């Protein structure tokens, strides 16, 4: 039996599980695990990952040095980086100039400070190479900011914040204040891996190299492929939201077409792309305005860029806080596009990532089925995560499994990200074995190797050691990924031929720009409402009742289950109710105020009843959902 080399270890995913409970129950056999995989069982795809989550923190740092990217003063302050006296003096001088640009701004206080600091930069290469005395400490802090917590709990908000730190590098802008990057300076970088990568990047940029004129994005793709090559991965599908943006998408596609043949020649790794559609608008970027009709624009751009053989599908992404059936009109239009114009185009929906919307897995399949006209063939589709759904042992669950089998849909599992984002704390009922046993096609993804500090081998080891997949079950997963690999090869050849016919000798940018404008213009005439939603903005409906929280008192927050999933009921414990009464009795209403959830039941009701019983005069505030019915 041939094995891929490994060792005995406590995986980071286990450390995360330990951090989530005081009552850790996994035995030694699942805690201290053997880190090898039988070669015949090794999976060779990553079919669920994201563009700005692939590269390791060290690789992003190396790219920041090579491309001399701007690094904001805000992050220097935020993670407490150390500058030389000369660097500090210069950046403060630069800040004064930026401050003058905002002297008439409507912003004030911390918001104005943040705005100024966000737009005051140091050359990242300068920060590291001309500050070697602080490089080891600074690199350690920067590295920590670029990956999700490994040994502790995290939530979706942590994920969004890490993405912001990564955007400085992944979407970086070169500094105007370039420095000379000397080999002796590179040799002083205290981290060997970063040092090696910077040297290779400099070598790649030599005039005789085929990568001499690589853009930042092209370098990212090159290093993503090199990393996958080390992992034994041969086919990857990456979700990228830039592929749904007007003009930007065409620019990205030009870079992809130029670099990918070179990358495949060197690494034998084939990378293809899914156009990412946000299920809700992105709000974490303060200055990024999302068009009210962004879904319409996304669809029109996808229909433009999907002419390219490198665009193999679409992906509904983002935090799963809404019912997927709200997006039925969008799904319908994509399905009709796939069926009528782009046979083989894959529709992926993130569903079942957390337990708040367990019906989304089944509803996602129904949305696709309901999009078909009589006689039309089911398009290729995959579900990302699929962790939570109806009880698979129930009649409804059996119907779901049968529906997956009949439609040929596939489910992608990412164990590490589910544990890291606190969406999974118990492995006993993980559904993958049930799906495989019942003939549902299952695949593996990483959700972003660099983001979670893992690779595809780590992910497969987790399925082996923690979920207990057998060689026979891995063989079935290999059969599913082989189906994807074979389809991707045939699809690329067919689509590449059609793309050349579409271009008809024209420049790619010109041809796609014309088509983009035609599609956008046609889209303006389409009056179909793309989001079905009966929910109302709580901020508007409750505007008469909304008040700012007191600044002169201390909040006491009592979370009693208001935001539980629908099927979870809060049962009031008598001892806990007595403790709450004692707490409320001892609190001084002149110094504190109470904060509870919006449902006047469970412990929230106990709080209100106790305050009334004790005749206390507390200010009580309730957090409410953003949307209400």
Regions found by a protein language model. Give the residues of each.
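Acidic/glycine-enriched connector segments
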Residues: 534-629
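Metal-cofactor-binding active-site regions of metalloenzymes
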Residues: 2-533
């Amino acid at each position: 039996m041939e094995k891929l080399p490994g060792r005995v270890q406590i995986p980071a995913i286990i450390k995360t599980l330990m951090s989530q409970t005081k009552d850790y129950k996994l035995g030694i056999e699942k805690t201290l695990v053997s880190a090898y995989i039988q070669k015949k069982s090794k999976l060779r795809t990553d079919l669920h990952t994201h563009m700005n989550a692939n590269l390791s923190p060290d690789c992003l740092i190396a790219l920041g040095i090579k491309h001399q990217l701007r690094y904001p003063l805000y992050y220097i302050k935020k993670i407490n980086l150390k500058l030389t006296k000369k660097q500090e003096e210069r950046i403060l001088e630069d800040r004064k100039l930026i401050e003058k640009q905002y002297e008439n701004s409507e912003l004030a206080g911390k918001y104005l400070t943040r705005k100024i600091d966000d737009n005051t930069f140091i050359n990242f290469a300068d920060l590291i190479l001309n500050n070697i005395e602080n490089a080891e400490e600074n690199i350690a802090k920067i590295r920590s900011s670029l990956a999700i917590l490994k040994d502790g709990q995290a939530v979706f908000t942590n994920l969004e914040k890490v993405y912001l730190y990564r955007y400085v590098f992944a979407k970086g802008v070169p500094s105007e204040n370039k420095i000379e990057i000397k080999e002796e300076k590179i040799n002083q970088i205290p981290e060997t891996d970063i040092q090696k990568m910077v040297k290779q990047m400099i070598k790649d940029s030599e005039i005789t190299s085929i990568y001499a004129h690589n853009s930042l994005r092209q370098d990212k793709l090159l290093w993503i492929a090199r990393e996958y090559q080390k992992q034994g991965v041969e086919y990857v599908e990456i979700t990228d939201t830039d592929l749904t943006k007007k003009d930007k998408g065409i620019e990205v596609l030009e870079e992809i077409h130029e670099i990918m043949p070179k990358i495949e020649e060197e690494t034998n790794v084939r990378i293809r792309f899914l156009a990412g559609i946000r299920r809700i608008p992105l709000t974490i970027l303060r200055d990024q305005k999302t068009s009210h009709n962004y879904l319409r624009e996304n669809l029109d751009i996808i229909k433009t860029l999907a002419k390219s053989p490198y665009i193999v599908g679409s992906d509904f992404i983002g935090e799963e806080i809404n019912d997927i059936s709200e997006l039925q009109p969008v799904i319908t239009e994509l399905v009709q596009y796939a069926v009528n114009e782009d046979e083989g185009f894959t529709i992926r929906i993130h569903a079942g990532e957390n337990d708040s919307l367990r019906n989304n897995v089944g509803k996602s399949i129904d949305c696709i089925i309901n999009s078909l006209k009589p006689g039309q063939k089911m398009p290729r589709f995959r579900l990302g995560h699929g962790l939570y759904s109806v009880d698979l042992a129930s009649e409804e669950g059996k119907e779901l499994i049968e529906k997956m089998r009949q439609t040929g849909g596939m489910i992608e599992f990412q164990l590490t990200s589910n544990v890291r984002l606190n969406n999974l704390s118990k492995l006993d009922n993980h559904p993958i074995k049930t799906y495989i046993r019942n003939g549902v096609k299952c695949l593996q993804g990483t959700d972003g190797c660099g983001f979670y500090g893992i690779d595809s081998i780590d992910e497969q080891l987790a399925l082996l050691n923690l979920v207990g997949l057998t060689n026979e079950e891995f063989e079935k997963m290999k059969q599913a990924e082989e189906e994807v690999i074979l389809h991707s090869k045939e699809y690329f050849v067919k689509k590449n031929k059609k793309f050349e016919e579409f271009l008809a000798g024209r420049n790619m940018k010109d041809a796609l720009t014309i088509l983009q404008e035609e599609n956008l213009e046609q889209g303006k005439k389409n009056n179909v409402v793309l989001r079905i939603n009966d929910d109302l903005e709580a901020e508007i409906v409750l505007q008469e009742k909304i008040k700012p929280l007191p600044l002169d008192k201390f909040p006491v927050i009592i979370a009693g289950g208001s935001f539980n999933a629908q099927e979870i009921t809060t049962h009031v414990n008598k001892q806990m109710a007595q403790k709450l009464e004692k707490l409320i009795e001892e609190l001084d209403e002149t110094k504190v105020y109470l904060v509870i959830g919006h449902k006047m039941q469970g412990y929230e009701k106990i709080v209100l009843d106790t305050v009334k019983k004790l005749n206390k005069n507390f200010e009580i505030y309730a957090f409410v959902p953003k949307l209400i019915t």
